[in-house]
Amino acid sequence: VNFQPWFFVVIKGEKGCNHIRQCYDREWFRSAPIYILVCADHRSSWIRKSDGKDHADIDVAIATEHICLAATEKELGTCWVCNFDTDLCKQLFNLPNGVEPVVIVPIGYPKEPEVFVSTPKRRKAFNEIVKWENF
C-alpha cells in the first residue's frame, strides 16, 4: 500500500517565515532560512483493518526522516520540531480539514562545531529497549 498521505509546505518567503515563527517562537528557530511544514493528510491515509489504526503519522515520520537525511548529505542542518501551536499553524497556512501539521523542519547551515556545547545524553540500555522472542 503506497497512499503517500503527506503534504509538504516549503516556507522561505518573509510572510511564511513570519507565520511559522509565530507557531514556534524560539531564538535558534528564527535563524533558519527555510522551513518545511510536514502535514499528514488523513483524508488519504491507509487504515489498518484489524484495529482502525491510521498510519498517516508513521508515513509522515518516514518521509520527514528521509528529508533530514538528504539535507545532512548536503551538509545542511535540520531539526524535528513537534512542540508547536498546531491550531495557529492550520489557520496561518490555510490547511484544509483532514490535513494535520505534524512536524516543522527548519533547514540551514549549522554553526561551526566548536560553537556547540555538548551535553551528555542518557541513552537507555540495549536490554531496556530490545527483547528476544517475547516482550
Feature annotation, model-predicted:
Residues 1-34, 135:
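N-terminal amphipathic, basic helical "cap/leader" segment at the start of enzyme domains
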Residues 33-35, 78, 100-104:
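Structural motif
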Residues 11-18, 41-45, 86-87, 111:
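Short, charged/polar surface micro-motifs in flexible loops or helix N-caps
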Residues 103-135:
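C-terminal helix-cap and adjacent tail motif
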Residues 36, 51-92:
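Small-aliphatic-rich amphipathic alpha-helix that forms the alpha element of a beta-alpha
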Residues 89-102:
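Short, electropositive alpha-helical surface patch
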Residues 25-60:
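Helix-adjacent hinge/juxtasegments
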